[in-house]
Amino acid sequence: MAHKKGVGSSRNGRDSNPKYLGVKIFGGQAIDAGNIIVRQRGTQFHPGAGVGLGRDHTLFALVDGKVEFSTKGPKKRRTVSVVAEA
């Protein structure tokens, strides 16, 4: 017989770190090339002109300019573009 009661561990006690997702630069704001516009899981926003798509679906500026959000196509696909300022 055991002299001590067996102590079970609870199955809680874990929490993941926040991922800080979302839009970082909003429409009409100026941006430099290389800066992050949107951090996302999957393509909620699709890259347009002047915008690149990272390995984790992060959208970033390829050129300096102003950020523009638009909705295109029959599926109402949201795209992000960077319009270079002259």
From Swiss-Prot:
Highest taxon above the source species: Bacteria
Q: Which GO terms describe its biological process?
A: translation
Ribonucleoprotein: is it a keyword of this entry?
yes
InterPro entries found in the cross-reference section: Ribosomal_bL27, Ribosomal_bL27_CS
Q: What is this protein called?
A: Large ribosomal subunit protein bL27
Q: Give the signal peptide as a residue range, or say none if absent.
A: none
* PANTHER family named among the record's database cross-references: LARGE RIBOSOMAL SUBUNIT PROTEIN BL27M (PTHR15893:SF0), RIBOSOMAL PROTEIN L27 (PTHR15893)
Origin organism is Xanthomonas euvesicatoria pv. vesicatoria (strain 85-10)
Q: What PROSITE patterns does the annotation carry?
A: RIBOSOMAL_L27
Give the gene that encodes this protein.
rpmA
Keywords, sorted A to Z:
Ribonucleoprotein, Ribosomal protein
Q: What GO molecular functions are on record for this protein? A: structural constituent of ribosome
Homology family? Belongs to the bacterial ribosomal protein bL27 family.
Identify one Gene Ontology CC term for this UniProt entry. Answer: cytosolic large ribosomal subunit
